[in-house]
Amino acid sequence: TFNLSIVEEFFNVVTSNDVKPVDGTVDLEAGRTERLKLFEESLLYTTEREFFDEHFCRYPVIRINFKEVSASSLGTFYKKLAASLHSTLDRWLRQLEGADLDTRAKASHQRVVEYHDSMELHLEKTAQHWELQESDAENIFVRLSNLLHDVYMSQYVVLFDEYDKPLKAIRGQPWEKAAAEMYTSLVNKIFKDNNDLKCGLLVGVYKLPLVDIGSGANCVHFLPLTVHGYHSGLNDDRGQPAVLHNSLVDMFAHDGTEVRLLVEAARGRYRRISYYSTEVIMTTLTKWYDGYAFGGTGGKFNPYAVAMFLRELEHGNVNFATQDYWQDTEN
């Protein structure tokens, strides 16, 4: 999810909500300059400059998260999918508040606002699946797609978090086939023959056969978090043990070098943290938070836990600094 946020910051256009008005004027270029600070020392900026300049802040980003999708009934499944996409639509409407739109875009925006408000009431009242059409989730996406096209006249990027959650939720249910067909239709709508789509990134815990379920998303490239030569215990599409590459192993969590940099920066900035030597802090952090392993590679630190530890240390809460922070989250 954190990595998706970085991808979103890179591709997403700057909106009026990203910039503080000065004398009633919104300077979007100033917002772009401010966002550039996030990437100025990145490898992408320093080694892939042509790509960077071509795509930075260029496309509206549609970010979808199906974390809340559950399946106690077919009706619940329809509603949760629609509600998740409605939240995505809601975020974009808020981003476009105060935007300087031309006549066509303004009319499109008003139509979508009215649709958004009516759908919000509909979702609040819906209790049974026959009150919510299975096409409602698709309709919400289409409305958002059309709006972004009218406003920006460009393609968009789709970031799809927990794409596997809906199919896992319906597995073994008596209405699994109907739900799978509905979800397949939605994936079709987003990824197949969509001329407004620049590219998409789907993230999930389990590799699911999107192509096999007939989604039409035939140009899918899998990027597994597995070290080359490491047998994950999973089988590939031919039933053979999966031996996969490691292109993303170093892209998640922190290693010891990165944590040491954070500790040294914190010691230089916060007086209470400076009471403790770098080695003392590193020993504690290593004992508590370096237990993560990706693709058979261990020694990874939990970024959230490290940040929370340093925050507690900054406030002088030495006795409470070491906790299992991650277990209290939903992730």
Placement of each model-derived feature along the sequence:
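P-loop NTPase motor core
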Residues: 3-98
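Amphipathic alpha-helical segments of the small helical/lid subdomains adjacent to P-loop NTPase cores
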Residues: 210-217, 223-309
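Residues immediately C-terminal
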Residues: 165-168, 192, 208
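Structural recognition of the conserved hydrophobic beta-strand(s) that form the central parallel beta-sheet
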Residues: 157-161, 181, 185, 198-205
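Short secondary-structure boundary/capping segments
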Residues: 6-10, 78-81, 172-178, 207-234, ...
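Substrate-engagement module of ASCE P-loop NTPases
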Residues: 89, 140-151, 177-198
